[in-house]
Regions:
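Non-catalytic, surface beta->alpha helical segment in thiol-disulfide oxidoreductase systems
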Residues: 59-89
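Structural micro-motif
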Residues: 48-59
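Non-catalytic interaction surface on structured domains
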Residues: 17, 28-31, 59
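Thiol-based oxidoreductase modules, predominantly thioredoxin-like and allied folds used
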Residues: 6, 29-43
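Chalcogenol-based redox active-site neighborhoods
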Residues: 47-48, 76
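Local sequence-structure signature of Cys/Sec-based thiol-disulfide redox active-site neighborhoods
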Residues: 1-24
């Protein structure tokens, strides 16, 4: 599983989510995550059809297929639930 995180410096929810993801990346070192800036990484923003509803998180399976997309702030507990339920994807 890979997690693509989209955010921007002007996004308040992105600022809130950054430390949550930092904690999760330490707790789940095997989890592959990548961050893309909404204003700078336009190719990835277009590729994944990311709107300005940030933060946006796109979950990909091992084949690179999207299986879940969430926008807005997410509790750490909910993210853990998603990770554990899909860790073998």
């Amino acid at each position: 599983m890979k997690v693509l995180k989209f955010g921007a410096v002007w996004c308040n929810g992105c600022v809130v989510m950054k430390p949550r993801w930092g904690q999760l990346e330490k707790e789940f070192p095997w989890l592959q995550t990548e961050f893309y800036d909404y204003d700078r990484d336009k190719d990835m923003v277009r590729k994944y059809n990311v709107t300005d509803e940030l933060p946006m998180v796109v979950f990909l399976d091992k084949q690179g297929n999207e299986f879940l997309r969430i926008s807005g702030e997410i509790s750490k507990e909910k993210i853990v639930e998603i990770i554990l339920a899909n860790k073998d994807k």
